[in-house]
Amino acid sequence: MSAPVQCPIHPDVHLIEDHRAGDLVCPACGLVVGDRLVDVGTEWRSFSNERSGNDPSRVGAPENPLLSGGDLSTTIAVGFGGSDSDNSLANAQRKSMNNTDRQMTAAMSLIREMSERIHLPRNIQDSASRIFKDVLESKALRGKNNEAQAAACLYIACRKDGVPRTFKEICAVSRVSKKEIGRCFKIIVRSLETNLEQITSADFMSRFCGNLSLPNSIQAAATRIAKCAVDMDLVAGRTPISIAAAAIYMASQASAEKRSAKEIGDVAGAAEITVRQTYKLLYPKALELFPKDFRFVTPIDALPNS
């Protein structure tokens, strides 16, 4: 019976699958532990009659500018029961491996894994990896948890690319606390002097309404309700997420597509009581908040007051 695949240095750490490189990577130290996912497809091709000016022949993966060597280097890992010479070779190579590259490789795998879980596109992953590279070079987060750093970089990349995710969403696909991610986020923004656009409730409307299977008419009404509430200074001190959730609750309750405060809170990552408390701030001005052309199924005076 074969021994389980695990990092010889951190045997209790859950390994990350790097599908593109075909590797199993230890997120704690960046060690490539196994290669069970290698793509068996053709690695290169060449046709003499192709008209393209570029030579299509290529062996190996393209260079990665985020690594000092330009590409991922192979690290020898030895399972339990390996010979003394194997262990000596692995230890020598691990010691000689660039520490920055080791951290970078592990971080890119973490970022890719988290991104895939919440269906973020490749450009967001690349942006987060570049931010992580800048953080490494700045040494601002030296000694901080590698996964917390990667999660914070992913959060910032989402903000910068106009597809913001909440701290709770990022926390849910990582193995670190929201508090740790938040600390790293603050340090990164300060040290890199990163300018981030202010988040508004409108940034979340499309995704929240889509996840609730609400029609465009409800999304449009909720967007207007939230914007007017902010303009009228009804929701001072409330987060864009809770404002969006409360506006969706109000718009849906006035329509045939009703959704409960709990349903909306679950999608938005807000507590039901938070949705209701924010809604109570909107309710007295409901007549002014709704679009003029909104088709009420439930009139304003019949809406829940909390």
Curated annotation (Swiss-Prot):
Q: Which organism is it from?
A: Caenorhabditis elegans
Q: How does it assemble?
A: Associates with TFIID-TFIIA (DA complex) to form TFIID-IIA-IIB (DAB-complex) which is then recognized by RNA polymerase II.
Which intervals hold the zinc fingers (TFIIB-type)?
Answer: 3-34
UniProt function note: General transcription factor that plays a role in transcription initiation by RNA polymerase II (Pol II). Involved in the pre-initiation complex (PIC) formation and Pol II recruitment at promoter DNA. Essential for early embryonic development.
MF-aspect GO terms: RNA polymerase II general transcription initiation factor activity; TBP-class protein binding; zinc ion binding
Q: What InterPro entries does the annotation carry?
A: Cyclin-like_dom, Cyclin-like_sf, TFIIB, TFIIB_CS, TFIIB_cyclin, Znf_TFIIB
Positions that bind Zn(2+):
C7, H10, C26, C29
Q: Which family does the entry's similarity section mention?
A: Belongs to the TFIIB family.
Record note on disruption phenotype: RNAi-mediated knockdown causes arrested development at 90-100 cells and inhibits differentiation. The two E cell daughters (E2 cells), which form the endoderm, divide abnormally early, immediately after the MS2 cells. Phosphorylation of the RNA Pol II large subunit C-terminal domain (CTD) is reduced severely in embryos.
A biological process from GO = transcriptional start site selection at RNA polymerase II promoter
The record's SUPFAM superfamilies line, in alphabetical order, gives:
Cyclin-like (SSF47954), Zinc beta-ribbon (SSF57783)
Q: Which UniProt keywords apply?
A: Metal-binding, Nucleus, Repeat, Transcription, Transcription regulation, Zinc, Zinc-finger
**Cellular component, GO annotation:** nucleus; transcription preinitiation complex
Disordered: annotated span = 47-66
Question: What compartments host this protein?
Answer: Nucleus
Question: Could you tell me which cysteines form disulfide bridges?
Answer: none
Query: Which parts of the chain are sequence repeats?
Result: 114-190, 208-284
Q: Where is it mostly found?
A: nucleus
Keyword Nucleus on entry: yes
**Name used for this protein in its record:** Transcription initiation factor IIB
Q: Ribosomal protein: present as a keyword of the record?
A: no
